[in-house]
């Protein structure tokens, strides 16, 4: 993987990731949003449909794909790309977040995490080394280190111990990744909760180990938005400017805008797909809750400004009807629209940075959705931009 920082506009960054894959070179224009394909599928969508929304790269889930279908069947197909027939780049998370979300079903030790398989009930062990091996078999273009996702709230002492163990696991991840002679990219994950001094140590030590990109983890786990913004404003300037920056598990459209305002290049979230299945649709001027009875007789398109298959062909009344009847097509059409909305938003962001008018775009975006622009404390990046 190669990363090229092409342009900055304030703290917003315009770049390009280049991946060499068996079917040729693939480019990912950044800032980019990655749809989530937890089990090797973006729910309800074919790979062609996902690509038609403008998605350039997908996220797969190491933990879930390890439990089902397992490494052996993946190897028999070739890798995850062959298994799911998506031939563009794939980023896989390390399984850390899923393990830690198991709560009482898991036990964290220095060597790794012991937990109960939520499917079969058997005892299973996942370590940094094992995560690297699974992601190697998945053929992930971007591999994430195995870390502990520090919960919120967490005391300073707990966050410190957690961050320090994540650093030790980062080194073990790096070592095993190198032993496997994996030709793909490995990203470090910055932890430290809401504590700036812990985040500082985490970034410095990860940069010492050396990674192809750096993710900000442990945010969007229940902390106030102000804390997320503060940590991003603190951390982003400390990440080497020539490496991509990835904000994990975020988020709402305004979270993407706020992340870019603070220097983030990559995002992923289940929100557009999960919300679509629940009739919660993102449109140019905010939200449409298609289950609301007021849409029963609404023969207008979902979003007149959207060019997706759903908006070009169907009315709100039809989407309301499909949802009321529990038709699978309703969830599919909603998903097509929400994913296209997210990709259109990212394309608008990239164009605004290209044209040196990102600040104006931010104002326009918040005016459209009827919200105030959140304050930005961060000075323009200088020392390592």
UniProtKB/Swiss-Prot annotation:
Keyword annotations from UniProtKB, A to Z: Glycosyltransferase, Metal-binding, Queuosine biosynthesis, Transferase, tRNA processing, Zinc
Q: From the UniProt entry, list the residue stretches annotated as the region RNA binding.
A: 249-255, 273-277
Which InterPro entries does this one have?
A: ArchSynthase1/Queuine_TRR, TGT, TGT-like_sf, tRNA_ribo_trans-like
**One Gene Ontology CC term in the entry:** cytosol
Q: Which gene encodes it?
A: tgt
Its Gene Ontology biological processes? Answer: queuosine biosynthetic process; tRNA wobble guanine modification; tRNA-guanine transglycosylation
Report the cofactors: Zn(2+)
Q: What class of enzyme is it?
A: transferase
State the EC number(s).
Answer: 2.4.2.29
Read off the Pfam families from this record. TGT
Q: What is the lineage of its organism?
A: Bacteria, Pseudomonadati, Pseudomonadota, Gammaproteobacteria, Pasteurellales
Biological role: Catalyzes the base-exchange of a guanine (G) residue with the queuine precursor 7-aminomethyl-7-deazaguanine (PreQ1) at position 34 (anticodon wobble position) in tRNAs with GU(N) anticodons (tRNA-Asp, -Asn, -His and -Tyr). Catalysis occurs through a double-displacement mechanism. The nucleophile active site attacks the C1' of nucleotide 34 to detach the guanine base from the RNA, forming a covalent enzyme-RNA intermediate. The proton acceptor active site deprotonates the incoming PreQ1, allowing a nucleophilic attack on the C1' of the ribose to form the product.
For the keyword NAD, the answer is no
Q: Which residues bind substrate?
A: 93-97, 147, 191, 218
- Which organism is the protein's source? Glaesserella parasuis serovar 5 (strain SH0165)
Q: Which family does it belong to?
A: Belongs to the queuine tRNA-ribosyltransferase family.
Its recorded name reads Queuine tRNA-ribosyltransferase
Q: Which residues form the active site?
A: 93 (proton acceptor), 268 (nucleophile)
Please name the Gene3D superfamilies in this protein's record.
Queuine tRNA-ribosyltransferase-like
What does the record say about how the cofactor binds? Binds 1 zinc ion per subunit.
Q: Which reaction does it catalyse?
A: 7-aminomethyl-7-carbaguanine + guanosine(34) in tRNA = 7-aminomethyl-7-carbaguanosine(34) in tRNA + guanine
């Amino acid at each position: 993987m190669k990363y090229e920082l092409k342009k900055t506009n304030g703290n917003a960054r315009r770049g390009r990731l280049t991946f060499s894959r068996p079917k040729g070179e693939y480019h990912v224009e950044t800032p980019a949003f990655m749809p989530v394909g937890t089990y090797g599928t973006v729910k309800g969508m074919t790979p062609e449909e996902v690509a038609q929304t403008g998605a350039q790269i997908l996220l797969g889930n190491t933990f879930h794909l390890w439990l089902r279908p397992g490494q052996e069947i993946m190897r028999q197909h070739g890798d995850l790309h062959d298994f799911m027939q998506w031939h563009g780049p794939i980023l896989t998370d390390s399984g850390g977040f899923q393990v830690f979300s198991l709560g009482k079903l898991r036990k964290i030790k220095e060597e790794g995490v012991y937990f109960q398989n939520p499917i079969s009930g058997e005892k299973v062990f996942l370590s940094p080394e094992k995560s690297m091996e699974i992601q190697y078999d998945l053929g992930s273009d971007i591999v994430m280190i195995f870390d502990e996702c520090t919960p919120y709230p967490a005391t300073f002492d707990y966050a410190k111990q957690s961050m320090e163990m994540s650093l030790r696991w980062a080194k073990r991840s790096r070592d095993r990744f190198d032993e496997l002679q994996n030709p793909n990219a490995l990203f470090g994950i910055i932890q430290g909760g809401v504590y700036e001094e812990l985040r500082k140590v985490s970034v410095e030590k990860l940069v010492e180990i050396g990674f192809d990109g750096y993710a900000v983890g442990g945010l969007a786990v229940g902390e106030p938005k102000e804390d997320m913004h503060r940590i991003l404003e603190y951390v982003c300037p400390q990440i080497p400017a020539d490496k991509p920056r990835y904000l994990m598990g975020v988020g709402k459209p305004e979270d993407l805008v706020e992340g870019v305002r603070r220097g983030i290049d990559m995002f992923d979230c289940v929100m557009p797909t999960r919300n679509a299945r629940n009739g919660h649709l993102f449109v140019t001027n905010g939200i449409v809750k298609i289950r609301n009875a007021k849409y029963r007789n609404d023969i207008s398109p979902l979003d007149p400004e959207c060019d997706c298959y759903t908006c070009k062909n169907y009315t709100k009344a039809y989407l309301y009807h499909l949802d009321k009847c529990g038709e699978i097509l309703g969830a599919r059409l909603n998903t097509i629209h929400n994913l296209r909305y997210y990709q259109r938003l990212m394309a608008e962001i990239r164009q605004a940075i290209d044209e040196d008018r990102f600040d104006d775009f931010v104002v326009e975006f918040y005016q459209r959705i009827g919200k105030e622009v959140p304050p930005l404390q961060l000075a323009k990046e200088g020392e390592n931009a």
